[in-house]
């Protein structure tokens, strides 16, 4: 990485920024629309001598109008850039066509001479062509503004901008340099200014036209606002002015459509002669995602778990005491009556525990009979409790302990118990299904047909279809295929391109999505509600197609239905409605019946974990509050429409681990995120027993010792919390999770060794009763998996499940001393992490300070250091290296041979044309549907309910843009 940086900086340093060849385009008047030329003039303003700059500026001048200049200043970290971005959104909304220039100054570091110039990462409004932004370094100015800022302002005026904003770097108490270059000034601060006497020292409170108290949601802000009002009144002798008339506004710039920012724009717009159509709103109580009284939920959970173990330990001691007293009676009959009295006193306190012991012994006896019947959702399952080996040994499928000590047995029941019994440490079901393996294989590349063929290849000959879908980065960010180079290059690469409902129909065609043996997993987060609506509509329209076929009205697929030949095993099902809408093929009553039946039947999972995206990955597209609202709307829709077999979220630790977290951090952050969703959904009035069954989890498995117990610790913490803290029912107490073997453990060096690592990880997952498993292909360190590597990866778990005698017993980890020790150790570490997050205001509070991301980065760096210095041995990478291995450098590039999976230009073009054709076909219906969607969002309705209709006529990118305007874009911190 350092070599790449030095190479790039070396090339950049050779460029003469004000050389003649760069300035050749400056031949005449330049306007605000000529962004490249404006950039050249601003470069001249920073680098050229006074004479050269003045002559070139006059040569390029196109305007002499008077342009207002607004100065934006404030303390570092007060949120100036975020506030400026929110103002830009309002300016563009209320004054379309007005050209605005932003000149943002960042401090130059004395030691390196460099400046971050990072304010633009906070600016979501920059995509508008009416807005121009230039970052400037303060260089040797010695203050918060650049020495040549006045020149840059001259340029902006000369080319005809209508409004100029100048943002300074963070300032101290005595600074007011912005007033020397700006007509009007805003001072942005937060509640963290110290004692109230510190306000006396702040120069800008004397001179700023508007004072902004940002981050008003923070604790102490109301008191800070009162103190600032008092100070401004004293400074300016405004004692008779009402609070709302003071030039002071409280804002939450991080909150989209914040009424405080609306109020600020109302005060600012008359000062610059711009329109302001936003209604004035009184700053009232603002509702957070988590209610204030529940902000310490993670501490409550930690206390609940510890209290649970402590109480059961006391009960175990009493059981042990009773047992000892009974023994004493036998040996000292003379005091039997006194002992009976003591026993009876204790028995009253432990009656429930004695019943648990009796139930367990009855269960153990049933297991010994060789056959056992249990129920799942009222459906009986009768299983054999033993299996016979080739040597004719009769092996228990579930091995149970034979403790003689009642206290020891009770402690085991309270901490472990048999699989399928609270606290579900060993598994949420009594036995695994032998007729259904939990194998999932990830696929996604190119156009929908290409991935569909891979799905059919993986499913050929399988009784159960388990599809796991990877999407390209264009889809992951909610965009449509386009010719823009940064989009075109990513279309269909490392994932499938899906932009319309028809694409989803093609992708899953040939599979009956309502078959009880079919399940679909979708790895999508930012635009997950839109993709989910595509999927559910595809499933509904499949059943419409089946209904019509049963009536003898089979649909002949249109020419646009499928490109290329159908793969082996594809019967054409699902292609009849491509290019057609199911609700237009049958009457409304029939459609409603089929829709209801489909929603209650379809099986699968959508990842949709927006908290994890903010903490570890990067595909957040909507503002976090709006993204969480969408998640809540999806879950409410599931409750309202009896969606019982589909998970509304896969709370994911996998990507946290892939970003570098160790197994304890992965587990702690993931469970914390899960409990945050629980608190949020409960705050919306949802019944925990209605939504908890729709929650699933997703973990990574590596080779660290803690991975041995990651699932069992998760199940125990979840079950105890659900029962003891939330009062949830048995089904809600059962945590179900998917495991994917570690992608981070795959190495490009000696890639054949990767299958060995994956096999060990798969064995851990199967031993720990993971509900489903994906094994990575060995070549994923280099490319999207090929058919050959995927087949090998699938074979790994088939061999472990079907050939390994060890896995014939389904709870092999129980009873091992080291497993017990690891389980308690990891659980304790997770609870400590819960408390660390709680001290930072819960998951959302910790996210604001980037606690989770910082912790992940620290742990990743620790791992990389150990790997690079050899302390952590990686076979074939830093030890046991092959002297004859292929070298990975430019000298061997032409000799490198490996099949690489990439989307072809033809596939990219097909994706683009299909999307454009669909948009053209729908025409006015699309705009009408998008406006209706926005209205539902503005009114606080269920957005997903409306999305189920919108996706029938609008593409992914169209819907994303529409939701940006009512829900806001995600604003990046880094």
What would you call each of these model-derived segments?
Residues 2-69:
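Extreme N-terminal, non-catalytic leader segments
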């Amino acid at each position: 990485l350092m070599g790449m940086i030095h190479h790039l900086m070396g090339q950049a340093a050779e460029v003469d920024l004000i050389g003649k060849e760069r300035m050749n385009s400056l031949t005449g008047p330049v306007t605000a629309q000529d962004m490249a030329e404006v950039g050249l003039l601003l470069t001249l303003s920073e680098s050229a001598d006074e004479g050269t700059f003045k002559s070139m500026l006059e040569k390029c001048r196109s305007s002499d109008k008077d342009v207002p200049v607004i100065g934006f200043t404030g303390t570092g970290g007060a949120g100036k850039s975020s506030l400026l971005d929110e103002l830009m959104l309002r300016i563009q909304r209320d004054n379309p066509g007005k050209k605005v220039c932003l000149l943002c100054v960042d401090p130059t570091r004395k030691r390196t001479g460099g400046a971050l110039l990072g304010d633009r990462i906070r600016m979501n409004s920059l995509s508008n062509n009416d807005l121009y932004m230039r970052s400037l370094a303060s260089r040797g100015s010695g203050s918060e503004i650049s020495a040549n800022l006045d020149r840059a302002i001259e340029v902006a005026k000369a080319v005809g901008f209508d409004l100029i904003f100048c943002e300074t770097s963070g300032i101290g108490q005595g600074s007011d340099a912005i007033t020397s270059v700006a007509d009007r000034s805003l001072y942005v601060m937060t509640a963290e200014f110290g004692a109230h006497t510190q306000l006396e020292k702040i120069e800008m409170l004397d001179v700023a036209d508007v004072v902004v108290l940002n981050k008003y949601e923070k604790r102490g802000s109301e008191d800070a606002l009162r103190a600032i009002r008092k100070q401004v009144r004293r400074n300016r002798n405004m004692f008779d002015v009402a609070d709302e008339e003071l030039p002071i506004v409280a804002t939450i710039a991080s909150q989209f459509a914040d009424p405080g920012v609306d109020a600020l724009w109302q005060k600012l717009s008359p000062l610059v002669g711009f329109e302001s159509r936003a209604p004035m709103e009184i700053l009232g109580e603002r509702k957070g995602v988590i209610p204030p009284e529940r902000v310490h939920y993670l501490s409550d959970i930690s206390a609940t778990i510890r209290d649970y173990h402590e109480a059961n330990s006391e009960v175990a001691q009493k059981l042990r005491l009773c047992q000892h007293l009974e023994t004493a009676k036998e040996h000292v009959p003379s005091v039997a009556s006194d002992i009976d009295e003591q026993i009876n006193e204790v028995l009253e306190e432990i009656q429930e525990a004695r019943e648990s012991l009796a139930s367990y012994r009855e269960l153990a006896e049933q297991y010994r009979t060789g056959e056992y019947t249990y129920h799942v959702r009222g459906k009986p399952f009768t299983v054999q409790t033993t299996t016979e080996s080739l040597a004719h040994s009769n092996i228990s499928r579930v091995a149970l302990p034979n403790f003689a000590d009642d206290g020891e047995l009770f402690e085991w029941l309270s901490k472990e118990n048999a699989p399928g019994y609270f606290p579900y440490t060993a598994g949420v079901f009594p036995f695994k299904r032998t007729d259904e393996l939990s194998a999932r294989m990830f696929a996604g590349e190119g156009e929908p047909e290409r991935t569909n063929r891979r799905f059919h290849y993986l499913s050929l000959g399988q009784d159960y279809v388990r599809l796991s879908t990877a999407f390209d980065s264009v889809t992951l960010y909610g965009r449509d295929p386009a010719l823009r180079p940064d989009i075109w290059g990513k279309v269909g690469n490392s994932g499938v391109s899906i932009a319309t409902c028809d694409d989803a129909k093609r992708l899953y065609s040939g599979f009956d999505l309502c078959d009880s043996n079919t399940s679909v997993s979708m790895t999508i987060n930012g635009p997950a509600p839109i993709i989910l609506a595509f999927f559910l509509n595809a499933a509904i329209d499949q059943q419409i197609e089946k209904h019509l076929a049963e009536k003898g009205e089979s649909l002949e697929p249109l020419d646009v239905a499928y490109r290329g030949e159908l793969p082996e095993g594809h019967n054409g099902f699902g292609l009849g409605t491509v290019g057609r809408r199911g609700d237009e093929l049958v009457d409304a009553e029939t459609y409603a019946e089929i829709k209801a039946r489909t929603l209650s039947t379809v099986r699968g999972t959508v990842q949709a974990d927006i908290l994890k995206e903010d903490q570890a990955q990067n595909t957040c597209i909507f503002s976090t509050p709006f993204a969480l609202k969408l998640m809540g709307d999806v879950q409410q829709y599931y409750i309202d429409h009896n969606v019982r077999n589909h998970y509304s979220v896969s709370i994911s630790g996998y990507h946290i681990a892939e970003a570098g977290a160790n197994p304890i951090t992965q587990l702690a952050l993931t469970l914390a995120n899960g409990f945050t969703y629980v608190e949020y959904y409960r705050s919306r009035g949802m019944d925990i027993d209605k939504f908890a069954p729709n929650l699933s989890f997703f973990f990574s498995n590596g080779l660290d010792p803690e991975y041995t117990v990651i699932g069992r610790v998760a199940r125990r913490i979840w079950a105890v919390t659900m029962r003891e803290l939330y009062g949830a029912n048995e089904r809600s107490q059962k945590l179900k999770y998917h495991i994917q073997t570690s992608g981070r453990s795959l190495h490009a060096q000696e890639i054949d060794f990767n299958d060995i690592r994956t096999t060990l990880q798969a064995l851990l997952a199967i031993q720990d009763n993971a509900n489903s498993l994906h094994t990575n292909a060995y070549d994923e360190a280099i490319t999207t998996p090929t058919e050959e590597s995927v087949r090998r990866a699938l074979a790994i778990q088939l061999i472990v499940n079907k050939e390994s005698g060890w896995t014939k017993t389904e709870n092999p980890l129980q009873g091992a001393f080291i497993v017990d020790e690891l389980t308690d150790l990891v659980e304790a570490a997770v609870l400590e992490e819960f408390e660390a997050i709680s001290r930072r205001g819960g998951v959302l509070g910790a996210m604001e300070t980037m606690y989770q991301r910082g912790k992940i980065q620290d742990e990743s760096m620790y791992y990389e250091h150990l790997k690079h210095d050899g302390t952590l041995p990686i076979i074939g990478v830093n030890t046991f290296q092959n002297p004859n291995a292929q070298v990975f450098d430019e000298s061997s590039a032409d000799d490198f041979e490996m099949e690489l999976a990439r989307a072809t230009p033809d596939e990219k073009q097909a994706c683009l044309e299909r999307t454009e054709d669909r948009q053209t076909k729908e025409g006015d219906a699309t705009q009408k549907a998008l406006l209706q969607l926005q209205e539902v969002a503005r009114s606080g309705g269920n957005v997903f309910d409306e999305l189920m209709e919108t996706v029938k006529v609008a593409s992914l990118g169209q819907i994303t843009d529409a939701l940006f305007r009512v829900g806001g874009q995600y604003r990046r911190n880094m």
